[in-house]
């Protein structure tokens, strides 16, 4: 086994953050280092990378040395080779930093055990160095893993209420506001592509949010799934807590809907692959109803995927938006199918982080948000729903995802 026996507390609590039943990043992929001579005097354990991951890093380090020799001989690098060289350089720098911090920890550990006169000072340095070392280890694992195929893409978020009636619609609006707040916090450009409110205007029936920042998909893809809220509705007279849900779909944004000609979109599909229906926009009546045939419905015949768009008064703009969403849905569908085939080929037993079950609970009475995939809990609902502390939840899930992908990589080897 590549995992040594270790002991960790079942739950660690720090500034309102809980790490529950899921183990922290690297633990299941590493051996925990302890020193039996210390008699418990060493304040914090640290974890070493799996030998298989270290071997992979050493392989990249050796490849970089070969490329350095080529450069010193005046061999020209094309654009792709320059990018590969830059990637290897960044990875090797992190690997060197990892080894340096690991050696420092081992030296301090030995000092704590063997030199009582320096023990107090060494223990303090040791405790300060462990989290720095773990952060470096996490960065190294992320660099060793293959990137997500759409990691550099902008993103589209589709939000729809689930069970819970009006309360689910209100919660869907809360989630939309959270993602807008998060985009503002990250200083990302965004646009609401479509938003359909319910009759009372208190919630939304569906919405599509475009995050135009390159790489935002890699960050937000962990938001895909069913979100659950537990709270007392304003209309509840007996003080009972109600449970409602909303579904979030996160897609990579493929193409540029600001293109001057819609022909560019249609040329990406074979003749007869797309059925385009033009119709009059529907709405609440009065000024909300368009008097021209501007609404567009696209049907991708091979897959049966249908996209309708009527938010713009211009048929051209609605068609462009519809093609953008259709291409994003098709790209995500193909990626998921490919992942499923690879998973079956490896006979992997690792659960997918893209499951469409309840991924997260927002509990208002307890001021608690819990991500059920990685066991992360944060006691600050207003901070998360404002978008300002959503990064902490996403980061916990990102680390868990890295752990699972690294585990798959090791098992496949």
Curated annotation (Swiss-Prot):
GO annotation, cellular component aspect: mitochondrion
| SMART domains for the chain | PCRF (SM00937)
Q: Which residues carry this modification: N5-methylglutamine?
A: 287
Q: Which GO terms describe its molecular function?
A: translation release factor activity
One record GO biological process: mitochondrial translation
Q: Does the keyword NAD apply?
A: no
| Regions that span the bilayer | none
Gene3D superfamilies for the chain: 3.30.160.20, 3.30.70.1660, 6.10.140.1950
Location, primary (coarse class): mitochondrion
How is the protein altered post-translationally, as described in the entry?
Methylation of glutamine in the GGQ triplet is conserved from bacteria to mammals. N5-methylated on Gln-287 by MTQ1.
Entry keyword set = Methylation, Mitochondrion, Protein biosynthesis, Transit peptide
Record's subcellular location: Mitochondrion
Q: What does this protein do?
A: Mitochondrial peptide chain release factor that directs the termination of translation in response to the peptide chain termination codons UAA and UAG.
UniProt similarity note:
Belongs to the prokaryotic/mitochondrial release factor family.
Query: Which PANTHER family does the entry link to?
Result: LD18447P
Q: What else is known?
A: Present with 414 molecules/cell in log phase SD medium.
UniProt name for this protein: Peptide chain release factor 1, mitochondrial
**Native species of this protein?**
Saccharomyces cerevisiae (strain ATCC 204508 / S288c) (Baker's yeast)
């Amino acid at each position: 086994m590549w995992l040594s026996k270790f002991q960790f507390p079942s739950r660690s609590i720090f500034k309102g953050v809980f790490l529950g039943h899921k183990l922290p990043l690297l633990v299941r992929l590493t051996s925990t280092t302890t020193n039996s001579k210390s008699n418990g005097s060493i304040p914090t354990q640290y974890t070493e990378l799996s030998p298989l991951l270290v071997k992979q890093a050493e392989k990249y380090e050796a490849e970089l040395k070969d490329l350095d020799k080529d450069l010193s001989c005046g061999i020209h690098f094309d654009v792709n080779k320059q990018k590969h060289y830059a990637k290897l350089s960044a990875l090797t720098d992190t690997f060197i930093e990892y080894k340096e911090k690991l050696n420092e920890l081992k030296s301090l550990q030995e000092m704590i055990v063997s030199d009582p006169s320096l023990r107090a000072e060494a223990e303090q340095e040791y405790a300060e160095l462990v989290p720095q070392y773990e952060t470096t280890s996490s960065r190294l694992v992320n660099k060793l893993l293959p990137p997500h195929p759409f990691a550099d893409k902008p993103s589209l978020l589709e939000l729809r209420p689930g069970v819970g009636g009006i309360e689910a619609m209100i919660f869907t609006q809360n989630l939309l506001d959270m993602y807008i707040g998060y985009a503002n916090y990250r200083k990302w450009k965004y646009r609401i592509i479509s938003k359909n409110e319910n009759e009372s205007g208190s919630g939304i029936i569906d919405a599509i949010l475009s995050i135009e920042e390159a790489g935002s998909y890699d960050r937000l893809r962990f938001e895909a799934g069913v979100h659950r809220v537990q709270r007392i509705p304003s209309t509840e007279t007996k003080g009972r807590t109600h449970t409602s849900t909303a579904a979030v779909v996160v897609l990579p944004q493929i193409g540029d809907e600001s293109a001057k000609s819609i022909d560019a979109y249609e040329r990406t599909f074979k003749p007869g692959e797309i059925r385009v229906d033009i119709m009059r926009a529907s709405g609440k009546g009065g000024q909300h109803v368009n008097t021209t045939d501007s609404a567009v419905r696209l049907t991708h015949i091979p897959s049966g995927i249908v996209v309708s768009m009527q938010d713009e008064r211009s048929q051209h703009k609605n068609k462009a938006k519809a093609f953008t969403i259709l291409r994003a849905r098709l790209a995500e569908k193909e990626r998921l199918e490919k992942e499923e085939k690879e998973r079956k080929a490896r006979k992997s037993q690792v659960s997918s982080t893209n499951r469409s079950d309840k991924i997260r609970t927002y509990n208002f009475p307890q001021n608690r948000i819990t991500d059920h995939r990685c066991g992360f809990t944060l006691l600050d609902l207003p901070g998360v729903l404002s978008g300002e502390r959503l990064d902490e939840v996403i980061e916990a899930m990102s680390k868990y995802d890295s752990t699972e992908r690294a585990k798959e990589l090791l098992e496949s080897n």
